[in-house]
C-alpha cells in the first residue's frame, strides 16, 4: 500500500461490516465467520500487495457485539427511519454499516464519537455512490446523541 497506511481498526471495521453482511445473507454464525476471516481474509497478499493488518480482537468484538446486542441496536436504527419504513427495506450492506456503527456508539464509549461516525461514513462511501452515506451519517449522529449525551 503506497505510503497511505490504513489503521488496523479501520480495517477491522470494514471487515466487521463484511462479516455482518455475510452472516445475514448466508445464515452463518458469528463464530464461524470470525474464524473464516482469521484463517482466510486477514494478513493476505493480493497481487503482490500486502493488505493492511486488521485489529483482529477489535474485529471479533464488533462482530460479536452486534450479534449479541442486535435487538437493541436495531431499535435505535428503526427510530431513524422514515415513517412507514422497516429495517428490512434498507440494503443489507447499509444495515451492516449501521449496525456496526451503532454498536460502537452504544457500547464502546472508549472510541470518540467523531471517529466512529467518520469511519462508517467512509465505509458507506466505498459501497454506495448515492445518498446512503448521508443517511448513514445522519442516523449515526442521532444514535450518538441518544447514546452518549
UniProtKB/Swiss-Prot annotation:
Involved in transcription antitermination. Required for transcription of ribosomal RNA (rRNA) genes. Binds specifically to the boxA antiterminator sequence of the ribosomal RNA (rrn) operons. The keyword NAD does not apply. Keywords: RNA-binding, Transcription, Transcription antitermination, Transcription regulation. GO terms for cellular component: cytosol. It comes from Caulobacter vibrioides (strain NA1000 / CB15N). This is Transcription antitermination protein NusB. Belongs to the NusB family. One of its GO terms (biological process) is transcription antitermination. GO terms for molecular function: RNA binding. Pfam families: NusB.
